[in-house]
A protein has these predicted regions:
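Extracellular glycan-modifying ectodomains
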Residues: 1-397
Length: 397
């Protein structure tokens, strides 16, 4: 503890020194620009007055902050780590970053769904379920777990998290309407899986290992409850090799506190050993080839930690609509998935198990209704799998 106390003033002084040096360099540069080619060209006194006025009106401070924002975040994260702070507050409370006892970062849910919202969800689901039933289309809700679906004792004692209770509210709505439910949280507990091994340390998303595991669980229900003939042996662990990419990923929570607060993540990807062939339609782009060629996009490894969106390596990231066609399909059936960004690490592995076509929409960026895509593509089953963003979903309109 004494060492921490001695180090803290040095860190703070380093922060101030860096700030003032940056400010001085920026001020001198801007005075020179104003003197050489600005409105006060050739007049050093007026150039100085102009730049001082800019500082006093805060415009210069804004520019300086934007220019060095990443450095400030990194230094602040280091200071927070040294102080041992487990909760990093944001101006927007939903963006607060929490460090669990195991060192992983997370957010948390601040409240339950209101009765008004639940009634709306219930009405929409009831109408959509009846529409699918009339069209002889299967319907299932898959509850995607959250990192806080694990041990609640991992959270700081001051935090009250409503994540699992809000999931239970949603599940109750689906069950009341006689919609089949696959709760992956229960499967994790039944199989005694370490839930934190399924997630990145600095991000809310789950990883490649979770994607393969969840694809197998979903496929088993497709076979048992909907008459699919998926070859789930394709998802056996021994049929993959691990493409290791150490320290490639600073997740969304990590970007709010910097890489020194909780470290950075490896971004390891499970790649099938067997031959694969896909046609992947992503928004207006089409890619063809093997699993790795069509569904994995390594261009997102470029840039520094703050500018690198590594999670988008799966499927090239968020989409309005995608279609994954498996040229080596083992099951002549298709599904329409209503998803959010968690699907990026899941759908590539679902595709491996042999669906002829997987169609997916992300309602956060797609204004068309699910009904529109059901009418257009005639899927055998609609899979509604979310853990947030329920308000963005339009089922029928």
């Amino acid at each position: 503890m004494k060492k921490k106390i001695k180090i803290l003033p040095l860190v703070f002084l380093l922060f101030l020194f860096t700030h003032f040096v940056s400010a001085g360099i920026s001020f001198g540069k801007n005075v020179a620009v104003e003197y050489i080619g600005g409105n006060n060209k050739g007049n050093i006194v007026n150039s100085l007055k102009y730049e001082i006025k800019q500082i006093l009106t805060k415009q210069e401070d804004v520019n300086l902050y934007e220019a060095h924002k990443e450095s400030y975040i990194t230094i602040n994260g280091l200071v927070q780590k040294i102080f041992g702070n487990k909760i990093i507050n944001d101006a927007e409370v939903s963006n607060d970053v929490v460090k669990l006892k195991n060192g992983q970062l997370t957010g948390y849910t601040h409240s339950l769904f209101t009765e008004e919202k639940l009634k709306k969800y219930s009405k929409d689901i009831d109408e959509f379920s009846k529409y699918l039933n009339n069209n002889e289309t299967g319907f299932i809700y898959v509850q995607i777990p959250s990192k806080t679906s694990g041990d609640s004792q991992q959270l700081p004692a001051i935090i009250t998290d409503y994540t699992d209770r809000s999931f239970n509210q949603i599940i109750s709505v689906f069950k009341e309407k006689n919609v089949n439910v696959l709760d992956l949280r229960s499967k994790i507990k039944e199989q005694k899986i370490d839930i934190y091994s399924l997630f990145y340390k600095t991000d809310h998303h789950w990883n490649s290992f979770a994607g393969r595991w969840a694809a197998n669980e979903i496929g088993a229900v497709m076979n048992s409850d909907y008459g699919f003939t998926l070859d789930l042996s394709r998802l056996d662990q021994e049929n993959f090799y691990l493409n290791k990419n150490p320290k490639k990923f600073l997740g969304s929570w990590g970007k709010r506190v910097g890489p020194l607060y909780a470290g950075v993540d490896d971004f390891d990807i499970l790649i099938p050993k067997y031959e694969t062939s896909f046609v992947y339609k992503y928004n207006d782009i089409t890619r063809t080839g093997s699993f790795e060629e069509a569904l994995i996009d390594y261009s997102f490894f470029s840039g520094n930690y703050y500018h690198r969106f590594t999670y988008c390596t799966f499927l090239s990231g968020n989409f309005a609509f995608i279609n994954i066609h498996n040229n080596n399909f083992s099951c002549d059936k298709s599904v329409l998935c209503i998803v959010n960004s968690y699907s990026c690490a899941l759908l590539p592995y679902m595709a491996l198990s042999g669906y002829k076509d997987i169609y997916a929409i992300d309602p956060r960026v797609n204004s068309f209704s699910a009904k529109y895509y059901v009418d257009k593509y005639k899927p055998d089953v609609v899979i509604y799998m979310m853990n947030t963003d329920y308000d963005s979903v339009t089922l029928i309109k």
